[in-house]
Amino acid sequence: MHVVVTGAAGFIGSHTCERLVAAGHRVTGIDAFDGYLYPAEVKRGNAAELARLPADRFQLITADICDREAMARAIGGDVDVVCHLAALAGVRPSLEEPLRYLRTNIEGTGVVLERMRALGLARLVFASSSSVYGVRPGVEAEVVAFREDDPCLAPASPYAATKRMNELQLSTYRDLFGIGVFALRFFTVYGPRQRPDMAINKFVAAIARGTPITLFGDGSSRRDYTFIDDIVSGVVAAIDRVAPGRYEIYNLGGTQTVSLQELVEIIERVVGKRAVIERRPLQPGDVPVTYANVDRARAALGYTPTTPPELGVARYWAWLCDTGRAP
């Protein structure tokens, strides 16, 4: 099978490309190497890892998903599945430049869809986000996990809004043009190669160095942290199963919710040092909890996460140490 992966040099994209090639697929990776959220050198490092893949099974093309001509050159008619991971991520940065997020995430996805429509391609796997659920007042996170059929009417950030708009955009293309879509709602992914702006990366580095970490709020906000290997298993299963004319949404999470304070304590145990904590008020755009019900993904994709946070953080720390990246 020939798979196009957009955002191929990113955190999730690079791992997905490696897994697909290992499974025997041919992969064309596309990435803009944008330095907006973090230095482009980080993606260059990921690309160096991808360069070790067999040249007859993997190629990496530099292209912006918003550039129609570039995407026309990058995506050919022999493609079986498009795995669209490219996007501007991050809740807080989206508050500063919402128009930039709209252009990349909405227009860029539209360019990908139009290229697929022009070629008659009909199988797409899309990276959505748990942020589409927004704030759910009155829901006890420890009891009620997020289900795919829960209302998603109040995204708390421009980033979240773009991801929900993407889901509607993709549904429309299924209805009008028969493009099959599996939209995967990722829940706080972490692990080797994670973005440097992510909380776990920042906390691990600061605690290891003995420098202060900043906690927004009282530490009670909760996240469903999901290790990269589990996420990629779900992505590859979706690529194998997506079919023309189908539109499905699946949660991909770790199935347990951990408070920010608990996360800090896990990192302290793994790194072997105590955190120096500076507290700040809650930030706009943050939601109090995310928590995935993955029953639908388990039934349809065979998705079964196997990495609890303590083990995942330990594996991430081991990777930092083994690759000389540990502070």
List PLM regions with ranges.
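A short C-terminal helix-loop "cap" of Rossmann-like NAD(P)-dependent dehydrogenase/epimerase domains
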Residues: 48-56, 143-150, 177-178, 204-215, ...
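CheY-like receiver
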Residues: 73-77, 115, 206, 234, ...
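Short beta-loop-alpha junction of Rossmann-like oxidoreductase domains
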Residues: 135-137, 192-194, 198
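Hydrophobic alpha-helix immediately C-terminal to the catalytic Tyr-X-X-X-Lys motif of short-chain
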Residues: 165, 169-173, 203, 263, ...
